[in-house]
């Protein structure tokens, strides 16, 4: 991690195991699964994944960990206030506890302007940004430019791979002569995807930006894995207009929190079921064709503030990561 590892006591005390076991399920809902309990579990601590994510506990009370690097992207969808943002925060916390700033950068796109403000504290440690832009992307125009810059970053990395006859980021980093030459993984988190991709009104410029954003996301999802660029896409509007066939084809790993209708569940998972979830972080996790019901890890806003404040306070050398300017030459 940083100067020292992020201590688990930044997070609230775990709930004893007997409080979250199957026989404690009441009224169709499980007890809260604290983030601290899953991050302290051997399933996460001993995981050898490149980008381990402790998403929650199964209904057999086992910690569920998956590798975002293999996922390689994640779609999170469902009705409002059913656990979508909490799932995103669990992903971020998992990665902060497992990767050094030199190994990982985040890009946050927050069109609502209220979900990711605490993560601005990650600043020069964990964020990748355009030069001179806000650390948390909030406007549609800035989102379009940032995604275009990520596409250029991706193509620049592919150019390096082709020169060295290397196939992926893991091989590239193993052959790097110095730590400074290694590439960090870049995890781009997009909250309320629909706000960025559905044009506002009939203005041609708005339609153009929406189209460019969609095309950039699909391009990154199709090619980003090999060079360490991964997308997490979230929406509370799981309609076919938002979650298109192209999006579904490039996001085989999905999380559905409770949906309003059976149809919404089918849009997310290709099957019903999410409409019957209990809410409060109760979710269905799908990877390829396999599905599993999970009680999502919960991290409170207070815990997020403590965690990001701790990262901000660390005195180790900061490693800011500046994305290439859109339409500029790829950086060396």
Language model features by range: what are they?
Residues 6-7, 42, 287-332:
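Conserved alpha/beta core segments of nucleic-acid transaction machinery
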Residues 35, 122, 169-172, 265, ...:
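Generic structural signal of hydrophobic/aromatic residues within well-ordered alpha-helices
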Residues 162-172, 323-325:
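Short catalytic/ligand-gating loop segments at beta-alpha or beta-beta junctions
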Residues 31, 202-203, 316, 320:
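N-terminal helicase ATP-binding lobe
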Residues 1-12, 18-21, 38-167, 180-259, ...:
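P-loop NTPase catalytic phosphate-binding loop
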Residues 22-38:
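Interdomain "pre-motor" coupling segment immediately N-terminal to P-loop NTPase/helicase cores
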Residues 173-178:
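Conserved helix/coil segment N-terminal to the catalytic DExD/H
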């Amino acid at each position: 991690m940083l100067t020292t590892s992020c201590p688990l006591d930044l997070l609230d005390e775990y709930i004893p195991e007997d409080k979250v076991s199957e026989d404690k399920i009441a009224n169709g809902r499980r007890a809260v699964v604290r983030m601290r309990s899953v991050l302290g579990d051997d399933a996460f601590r001993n995981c050898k994944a490149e980008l381990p994510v402790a998403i929650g506990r199964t209904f057999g009370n086992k910690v569920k960990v998956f590798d975002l690097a293999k996922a390689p992207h994640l779609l999170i969808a469902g009705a409002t206030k059913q656990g979508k943002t909490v799932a995103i925060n669990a992903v971020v916390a998992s990665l902060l506890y497992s990767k050094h700033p030199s190994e990982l950068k985040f890009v946050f796109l927050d069109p609502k302007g209220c979900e990711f403000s605490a993560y601005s504290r990650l600043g020069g440690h964990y964020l990748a940004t355009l030069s001179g832009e806000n650390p948390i992307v909030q406007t549609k125009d800035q989102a379009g430019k940032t995604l275009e810059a990520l596409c250029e970053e991706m193509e620049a990395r592919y150019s390096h791979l082709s020169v060295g006859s290397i196939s992926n980021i893991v091989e590239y980093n193993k052959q790097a002569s110095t730590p400074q030459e290694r590439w960090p993984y870049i995890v781009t988190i997009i909250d309320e995807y629909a706000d960025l991709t559905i044009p506002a009104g009939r203005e041609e410029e708005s339609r153009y930006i929406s189209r460019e954003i969609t095309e950039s996301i699909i391009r990154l999802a199709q090619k980003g894995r090999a060079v360490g660029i991964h997308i997490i896409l979230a929406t509370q509007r799981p309609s076919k207009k938002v979650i298109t066939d192209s999006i579904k084809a490039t996001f085989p790993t999905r999380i559905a929190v409770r949906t309003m209708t059976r149809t919404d569940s089918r849009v997310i998972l290709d099957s019903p079921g999410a409409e019957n979830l209990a809410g409060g972080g109760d979710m269905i996790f799908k990877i390829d064709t396999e599905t599993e019901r999970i009680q999502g890890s919960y991290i409170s806003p207070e815990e997020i503030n403590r965690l990001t404040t701790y990262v901000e306070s660390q005195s180790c050398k900061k490693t800011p990561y500046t994305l290439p300017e859109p339409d500029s030459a790829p950086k060396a």
